[in-house]
Structure formats: structure tokens, C-alpha cells
């Protein structure tokens, strides 16, 4: 949904105050709104109301309903800080107030919210939702007939957050649950589930944006494909040509966006930050007057900077000790002209390709659904089936677009099961593309050998020397600490249709799919720890210094969900008996070692300084030279 309106209703009854449920609701609101402020969407609206409140302030003049935040879009950091401060100030003033005992204004608050939403958006197509924080599910004094009328009046869905300790059986008897079940797409969550959700790293969904559209060629001549004629490979009798397209399967996560700003004061002497524009200027050092400079001036800078125009700057190539500027005719020839395409160059066994050779973001290669035909789909499906049956991986030459970099990639076949619109199970056949390292990459990175050494007949060479045996055992010992080789996980846990993983709201809510919650514990899904750590520290800085007005900032500890992901906690079993035997390692008792060391020191006891001086005097008196004198 491109447009979204979220209205938060916080129950500020005494029970919510005493059990710190209002503080928990504020923590969720703060995290949610600060996340919304990063995107600053003009179509993402928020508002907030307080129910069961002794303060009355709303558009309908209904008692005990306080609109603490009017409709706001886009959500900004400044507005979020001001809103959380007002809510915190209210809680501090009424934390021990007993005047709101027995107030019941939740139904009135729902009606006020419904009228305000209708007045604000009228007939606009927008996702409307109300998030209610309460610990009293029996708060609604309403009959079944009134629930039907309220369902017709409310044109929004309700997301109920249960802040109490009610069991499932107690929930079933409450009027709140009846109202949630009566309104389509409404849900109910527990408050603790929301707190876990905002403190756990969430895997982002990769959007299916087409990144390549071209030909998958098998048996084609590479030289004949490097032309601008797209029908060249189609006319080759020895070439199997399939029209395919590529979509991103994984996406690299970048750090938080930062801008350079300067602190200034406005007319009201309030500090604010203004972005700084960067201007690049070029200058040269003029050495023409260097001979005329006196010796006293030579101690300082002997160069005179001369500013030059940007139009006078051109690229020069190093040739020996000089710089050469190529003419425009030769500059075009320095660019390697390449044309988009995917050429299969060979196949190898799946077990022969270690995972650490995959060095880029991966992409899905599928039959072209836009420019292809039925024959392309059948040929591509047959290729995937053959590779799956023989457990093969293809090595291909890949060019994503014209004049882009040429890469050698690995194509791994995958079979993904999902349900279509009619709930019919369907298998999607695809190839997963990932870049392989070049020689330049191996110069700066330590990659193990791709394949085991073999003879000309294909027989593997045996390593019989002790050094090779020790190296092999040590390699197995180190690999046993790796989390790379784990039990095979169903592909459905990783690759799912975009419709099953995308949500209709930007709110951080727990997933109703249990498989997705279990995937968060998968040791192969390692989140980008530094990004989440940056975000955690930044949000905590805003909370402490901007909202709580603290003078000092205390860096928060790393959440347990990230701590568990840093250290490998799942590894293979390895029998180290053979390695201990080859290396001759023996376990030595520490107490025995201390006693042997003490005996050796006593045996070779070093005399003190006075003893050495006395020995020197005796030696000097007893020498023949002194007696002759």
C-alpha cells in the first residue's frame, strides 16, 4: 500500500501506569516513529490519542479523550521527539493521579478516531489502521449488536496490543477479541512480542526489480556474440539460445546515511544544522619564481598555488616518468566494448565448488516472461532439471549490460515451491547466479584451491608426507569450527514469492508465519551487525540526550540477539585423537610443572649482590698481581 494512516490509542488508566505498560508503549512508539522519520514518506500519516484520560481535548469535545498528536505527514525526527516528550511529560504529571479511577472512554475514543479519519481523508484510497495499547480486554462494555454497528462505523482495521497477562481462554471471552474478529484483517499481539520485534534484527525483503534481460547461450562462439547484432547467436546452428531475465536474490546492506552539516543560529538564536555543499577547486603549484626567492623565504612554502578552471583539467596516463594525454580518437579505444549476455563455459560437480568462492550478491535467472515464449520456458526448465539430476553447477561468462564489466559466475540450479492465487502448489525453476573470483581477487585474498590435484587420468594425488598429513588434519580441525557446512535447509525457508513476505504496513509487527520466526534462529542468516549496532546507538543517543535531556551519554550494551550471531555456536564434531598423536602433544600437569621448575631453580640458585661483592674482594686479594705490588 503506497498510502498509510496509523492512529495510536494508548490506554492511560492507573493499571497501565503502575505496571509500566505505558512506558513500554512509549518505547514501541519511539522506535516506530523514528524509523518512519528515516524514510519521510509524505503519504505515511500518524496520529495519537489517549483513552481513559482525565484531560479532554479532541475535535468532538468528548470527555476523557485527549488527542496528543494530530495527523502528521511526513514523520520527522523533530516532531517525533516533541511528541514523545509531551507523552512523557503527561505520564510524569499523572503517574500518581487517582482522579482517573474508573474512567471508561475507550468506545468514545474509537468513535472520535473514526470521525477524525473520515474528515481527514474523506474518499482517498489509503490503508487505515488503529493500534490500541491496553491491558484490560474487558474494558469494552458493548453488546453483540453494538459490535456490528461499530464494525460498520469503523472503516479501519484494528491492531490490538494486549499489555496484560491474560491467557488465550480469557481472551476468547472478551469483547475486544469479538470486535477484532468482526473487523477484517484485524489482529491481536502481545506487548512482549512487540518489544522482542523492535530489539531483534529483521531481514529485509529484496524487491523483484529486473537487473538483466538477454540471452543464455550454450555452445556459442564468444567472438561472434560480441557484436551489436542481436540475431547473430540465433543463426548459429551449434548454439542453444534461451531468452532469460535476472532478478536480485540478495542485496548488500549499506551503512546509515550521513551528511556533513554545520551548526548555525537562526533569528531566534536557536541552534540548527544546515547541510554543507562541497565545491571542488583545482590548483597547480607554480615553480617559476622559485629561483628569485630568498633563502629566508625558502624555509617556508616555495610554491605559489594558482587556481585553474575545471574545464582545463583532463585525464592523463602515466608513461614512464611523464604523463601523456591521449587524443580523443584513442580515448574511445581504451574502453573494452562488451555486450549483454550469459554464455555457459562449462560444468562442474556441486561438491567441487566451495561456498567461499561466491563473492558477490546473488541473482535469480529465470526464463524471460516478457520477451520470451513457450520454447524458452521449456528449454530453460530442461536445463535446470538436468543440472539438478546430475548435481552440476555451470560456470558462465556474464555481462549485465553494454560496456559493463565481464564476470565469470557460477550458476546453481534451484527448485522453489510456492502456492499461486488458487492455492495450487507450483514449482519455479531457476538458476542462482553468483560471481567467481578472478586472479586479481586472489592476489589480495587467500582462496583455497578450487579442485583437488589429480593426475592426467583423473586419479586424485595422495598426500603421504607427514607435513601434508599434519596440514590436512589441522585444516579439518579448523573447518570443524566453521558454520559453513550445516544440515541442508529447505529452500522454501529462503526463497519465497514476494507476495508472501511483503507486509501491507510499515509497522514492525511479529510475523504470523511460524516458519519465518524460526528462520531468524538460522545460523546461516547472519545480519549486518555493524548496521544494527549503529542504529541502536543512534536511537539510544536520541532517547537519552534529546528526549530525556541527559547530560552524559551511556553507550548501550549489544543485544543478546546480535551477540548470539557474532560467535559461532553451531559447529561440526571432530576427533582430534589422530592430530594429537601426529603432533606428539602431551598433557602436562600444572602442579607437576611448577614443582619441576622450582627444583631446577634451586639447583641453579643465583647468589645475591652481597655474596657476589664478597667473592670479588676475595678474588682480588688472592690474585698474584696484587701480591707482587
UniProtKB/Swiss-Prot annotation:
It comes from Saccharomyces cerevisiae (strain ATCC 204508 / S288c) (Baker's yeast). GO terms for biological process: chromatin organization; donor selection; double-strand break repair via homologous recombination; double-strand break repair via nonhomologous end joining; establishment of protein-containing complex localization to telomere; protein localization to chromosome; recombinational repair; subtelomeric heterochromatin formation. Signal peptide: none annotated. Its main location: nucleus. It comes from the Eukaryota. Its EC number is 3.6.4.12. Residues 608-629 are annotated as: Disordered. It is found in: Nucleus; Chromosome, Telomere. This is ATP-dependent DNA helicase II subunit 2. One of its GO terms (cellular component) is chromosome, telomeric region. Residues 254-476 form the Ku domain. Changing residue 528 to A: In strain: DBVPG1853.
Amino acid at each position: 500500500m503506497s498510502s498509510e494512516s496509523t492512529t495510536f490509542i494508548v490506554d492511560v488508566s492507573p493499571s497501565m501506569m503502575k505496571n509500566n505498560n505505558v512506558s513500554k508503549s512509549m518505547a514501541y512508539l519511539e522506535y516506530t516513529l523514528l524509523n518512519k522519520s528515516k524514510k519521510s514518506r509524505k503519504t505515511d500519516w500518524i496520529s495519537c490519542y489517549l483513552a481513559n484520560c482525565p484531560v479532554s481535548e479532541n475535535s468532538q469535545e468528548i470527555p476523557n479523550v485527549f488527542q496528543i498528536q494530530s495527523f502528521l505527514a511526513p514523520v520527522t525526527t523533530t516532531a517525533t521527539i516533541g511528541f514523545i516528550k509531551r507523552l512523557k511529560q503527561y505520564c510524569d504529571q499523572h503517574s500518581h493521579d487517582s482522579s482517573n479511577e474508573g474512567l471508561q472512554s475507550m468506545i468514545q475514543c474509537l468513535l472520535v478516531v473514526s470521525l477524525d479519519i473520515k474528515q481527514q481523508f474523506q474518499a482517498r484510497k489509503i490503508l487505515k489502521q488503529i493500534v490500541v495499547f491496553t491491558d484490560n480486554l474487558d474494558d469494552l462494555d458493548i453488546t453483540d449488536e453494538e459490535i456490528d454497528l461499530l464494525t460498520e462505523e469503523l472503516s479501519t482495521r484494528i491492531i490490538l496490543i494486549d499489555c496484560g497477562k491474560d491467557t488465550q481462554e480469557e481472551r476468547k471471552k472478551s469483547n475486544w477479541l469479538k470486535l477484532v474478529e468482526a473487523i477484517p484483517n484485524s489482529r491481536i499481539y502481545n506487548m512482549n512480542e512487540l518489544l522482542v520485534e523492535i530489539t531483534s534484527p529483521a531481514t529485509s525483503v529484496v524487491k523483484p526489480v529486473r537487473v538483466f534481460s538477454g540471452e543464455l547461450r550454450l555452445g556459442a562462439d564468444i567472438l561472434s556474440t560480441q557484436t551489436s547484432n542481436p540475431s547473430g547467436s540465433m543463426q548459429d546452428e551449434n548454439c542453444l539460445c534461451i531468452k532469460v531475465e535476472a532478478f536480485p536474490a540478495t542485496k548488500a546492506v549499506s551503512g546509515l546515511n550521513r551528511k556533513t552539516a554545520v551548526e548555525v543560529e537562526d533569528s531566534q538564536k536557536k541552534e540548527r544544522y544546515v547541510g554543507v555543499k562541497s565545491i571542488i577547486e583545482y590548483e597547480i603549484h607554480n615553480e617559476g619564481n622559485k629561483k628569485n626567492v630568498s633563502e629566508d623565504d625558502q624555509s617556508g612554502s616555495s610554491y605559489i598555488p594558482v587556481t585553474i578552471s575545471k574545464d582545463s583539467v583532463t585525464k592523463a596516463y602515466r608513461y614512464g616518468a611523464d604523463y601523456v594525454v591521449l587524443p580523443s580518437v584513442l580515448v574511445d579505444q581504451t574502453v573494452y566494448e562488451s555486450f549483454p549476455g550469459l554464455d555457459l563455459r562449462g560444468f562442474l560437480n556441486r561438491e567441487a565448488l566451495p561456498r567461499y568462492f561466491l563473492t558477490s550478491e546473488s541473482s535469480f535467472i529465470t526464463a524471460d516472461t516478457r520477451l520470451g515464449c513457450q520454447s524458452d520456458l521449456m528449454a530453460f526448465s530442461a536445463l535446470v532439471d538436468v543440472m539438478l539430476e546430475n548435481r552440476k553447477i555451470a560456470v558462465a561468462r556474464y555481462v549485465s549490460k553494454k560496456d559493463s564489466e565481464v564476470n565469470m559466475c557460477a550458476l546453481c540450479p534451484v527448485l522453489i515451491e510456492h502456492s499461486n492465487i488458487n492455492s495450487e502448489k507450483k514449482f519455479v525453476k531457476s538458476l542462482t547466479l553468483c560471481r567467481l573470483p578472478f586472479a586479481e581477487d586472489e592476489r589480495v585474498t587467500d582462496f583455497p584451491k578450487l579442485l583437488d590435484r589429480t593426475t592426467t587420468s583423473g586419479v586424485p594425488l595422495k598426500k603421504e608426507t607427514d607435513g601434508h598429513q599434519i596440514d590436512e588434519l589441522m585444516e579439518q580441525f579448523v573447518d570443524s569450527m566453521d558454520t559453513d557446512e550445516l544440515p541442508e535447509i529447505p529452500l522454501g525457508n529462503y526463497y519465497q514469492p514476494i507476495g508472501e513476505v511483503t507486509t501491507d504496513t510499515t509497522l514492525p509487527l511479529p510475523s504470523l508465519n511460524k516458519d519465518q520466526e524460526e528462520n531468524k534462529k538460522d545460523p546461516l542468516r547472519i545480519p549486518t551487525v555493524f548496521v544494527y549496532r549503529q542504529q541502536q546507538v543512534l536511537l539510544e543517543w536520541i532517547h537519552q540526550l534529546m528526549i530525556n535531556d541527559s547530560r552524559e551519554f551511556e553507550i548501550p550494551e549489544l543485544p543478546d540477539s546480535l551477540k548470539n550471531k557474532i560467535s559461532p555456536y553451531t559447529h561440526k564434531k571432530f576427533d582430534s585423537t589422530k592430530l594429537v598423536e601426529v603432533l606428539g602433544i602431551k598433557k602436562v600437569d600444572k602442579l607437576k610443572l611448577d614443582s619441576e621448575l622450582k627444583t631446577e631453580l634451586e639447583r641453579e640458585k643465583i647468589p645475591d649482590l652481597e655474596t657476589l661483592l664478597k667473592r670479588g674482594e676475595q678474588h682480588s686479594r688472592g690474585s698474584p698481581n696484587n701480591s707482587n705490588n
